[in-house]
Amino acid sequence: KPEPVAIGKARVITEGETLAIVSIGTMLATCEEVIARLSKKGANCTLVDARFAKPIDTDLLDRLCKTHSALLIVEEGAAGGFAAQVMQYLVNAGHMDSNVKVRAATLPDSVIDHAERDFQLETVGLDATSLLQQAESLISDNINMANSAHS
């Protein structure tokens, strides 16, 4: 049965505790692939479908910053978009003063050569492999500890 969508409320796809990936728009399927690949490496991650560029779900962002060591915001948009709104909120709410690492994976603020979408995303680092590398760099200590435990 379909549930009503609350305006400004994100949807948590998977719940974890190390890294939270907050995706908006067309990047959700790619982020699901990244989460699956991280899980195989022993990382327990959260995936959020932001659903709304405005208003942003500040309650969820507050919770994620308190319960996760890192946050990766992913959007197929450029400077001044959703990721910028989230970062501004995190700064103003004091979350950037805490121990949470925050990164944004977005399109560059430049012209992208005409090509197939997958090639363009790979070129700008928004493909699954590039996002996986960014995520791993944020939580490398956690992945190394998980791999040691399985050895």
Across the structure, where does each feature detected by a protein language model lie?
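Thiamine diphosphate
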Residues: 1-151
